[in-house]
Every structure is written in structure tokens, then in C-alpha cells.
């Protein structure tokens, strides 16, 4: 079998395979045996008919079996020599007594071109600006939390705290029965459980209905047990002492908040930089993929979606009932997904980054917290579920790649407002 590359376009190669006379004879012999064992010819026992009779009676069947024989040989060679993104595609074939030729599309895994990490610019929010805002915000939260409550006889006003008994019914069923709740009547909260209470006094009963659609109407009955006026303590030494006995002065409280803020800042900035690193990697990498490959990927999934009428109509509606817009969205999805997958793999391969089984198992403690199960149960799941194991391994590999990029990239400090403005501008461009 001789292989000749006819054309090459990035990851796609069109190859012509030509078979020798001996291979043609072998293919015919195998094909005839297959057909002889399947067909019944009058006058002969099954599997005993002469090959020349089978050849003359079933020429197209024999030809089809020969093509399958050649196809299997080609696919085996491709599997051994290539890393495939798509199964091989038969483009053309020629089969005669003394000539056998097949033209095949081979779609390899695409490569990516990656910019030097030193060219990446990652943004880190200016720490002093963040800490100043964090301390101010935290002090105001503590001021609200430790407000002094003073019972009042008059009607409830905004910023008062109320204690109520709430009963909710629907369709004759009791959903909530006299549940005691305490909450603050904030002016910006327009829910009826707030707005309907303002102006009412202790001992009053408020009733109203809420329609949440789909024929579901809920009846609320709220008994007001207590109205309290909230007096905010000045942000001073008095507030510090109220928060905890370990603080004597406001400065001590501020120092404690700053230490807490520093720890949060470092964790959040670490994650923020790593997220930017991977985003920059994906955005700046060039995917070397043929349009023909993308077309094949899109049409394959498009046909699959179309077979599910409900799913197809839903997706079509999301894309202005335009099949071409849906195809374009699928294409963009594949481009982004492949850029991420293959750029991360390439960086990991070129920098000897890997994730061991022990490293995956060590994630069990974090997973246990996220999943709400024991650490031992999380470890058991990682051992028994290869799909989950591989998902965790992939996330850890992404983390290592991100850390490598952060080490080499240029990091610049920006003010929080600069970052907010950039985010608004990016959202505006995305909407347009």
C-alpha cells in the first residue's frame, strides 16, 4: 500500500492510497470468502458455491467487501501513525481488476501557536485602594450588625427591625406555619414583606397575595410581634468595644480588619491573575485548524441537534430562528474550546507539567467540602469514577499552567475604577 499526500491544509491532509496487485488479489479472496459464507445459491450447499459463480452473480457485493477490506487497512495505519480529531473520511475510490485507489481526508488534532508569556499583561488591583475600601465597607457592615435595638410603640419605618410570625398558604396547603423571622426594613427592598409592613405597629396583622405565575398564587399572613428602632453606633472606640472585648480602640479593630482583608486580597488576586492568565492564553493563541475540519465538526453536531426537535427549536429560537447563526455559534464554540484544550496541553507538554494520581486524591478534602460529603467518600468517588478523576486532573493541570504564566507575565497595578470601566466597555462591545 502506497500513501501519497495530495493536499495539506493545517491539520487536514488529503491522502491517496494505492494498492498493489497482490493486495488487490488478497482483498478479492477475503471478499469472496465473506460473500460465499453469506449467500445461498441453488444447487450448492451454503459456503460451498464456486467463487467464480459468486463473483459473476454478486459483483457489487464483492466490490463492497473489497472496499471495506482496503478501508480497514487504511484506518489501522492511520490509527497507528496519527492523532485524530475526526474519523477518516472517504473522498473517492477507484476499483478495477488491476487497480485499487482510495482518497481519504485525515483530520489530525490541530496545533496551536502560543505567544511568549512575557508578552502577556495581567492586571492586579492596586492593594492600597482595595484595602481602604474594604476597611470602610467592613466598618459600615459592623455598624449595621451591632446596631442597638430600642422597642418602639409607633408604626414601623424604614431602617427599623421587625420580628414577625409568617404564614404562607397556597391551594389550601400550608407552606409555612407561623415561622418567626427578624429582618430590617430597608427602603431599597421593594418586596411586599417589607413595603406592606412599613406604617404598621406591633400587634397588627398584614395579609396579601403574591402571584408568581403558572397559576401559583400564595397568600401571606404576617403578624407583627415587635418593632424596634435601630440606633447605629458611631464608628469609634465604642463600636470596636461592642464588636469584641478584645478591642479597646477603633484602630485595633481597623488593624484586625486589615489583616483579614490582606488575606482575602492575596487569595482573590491569586485567582484573578490565574483566570486572566488562561484567558490571555486562549485569546492570543492561534489555532491551526482547517475550515474543512471546522465544517465537519459543526455539521456533525448540527445534524445531531436537529434529530432532537425540541432541542433544535429551542437553540434555533436563541439564534433568531436562523440556522446559519446557530452554525456560526457552534463554530465559535469549537474554536474557543479547542484553543483552550490544545494550548493548555501544549504548554504542559513543553514545560513538563503533569498531575499525579496522588495530587488528584489530595483534592478530596476540598471536594468533600464542595460536595457536602466525607473526605473518605470523596476519595472513593475519585477512585471509582474515572470521568470525575479526569475532570479534577484537568482542573489541576489548568491551575499549574496558569501559575506558570503568572510567573512569567508582566503584571501591572490598576485602580479598581479602571478595572470597572474596562469591564463596562467590554460588556458594551459584547452586547454590540
Curated annotation (Swiss-Prot):
It catalyses: [protein]-peptidylproline (omega=180) = [protein]-peptidylproline (omega=0). It is found in: Cytoplasm. Gene3D superfamilies: Transcription elongation factor, GreA/GreB, C-terminal domain (3.10.50.30), Trigger factor ribosome-binding domain (3.30.70.1050), Trigger factor, C-terminal domain (1.10.3120.10). It is an enzyme of class 5 (isomerase). GO terms for cellular component: cytoplasm. Residues 159-233 form the PPIase FKBP-type domain. Its main location: cytoplasm. NCBIfam families: tig. Involved in protein export. Acts as a chaperone by maintaining the newly synthesized protein in an open conformation. Functions as a peptidyl-prolyl cis-trans isomerase. This is Trigger factor.
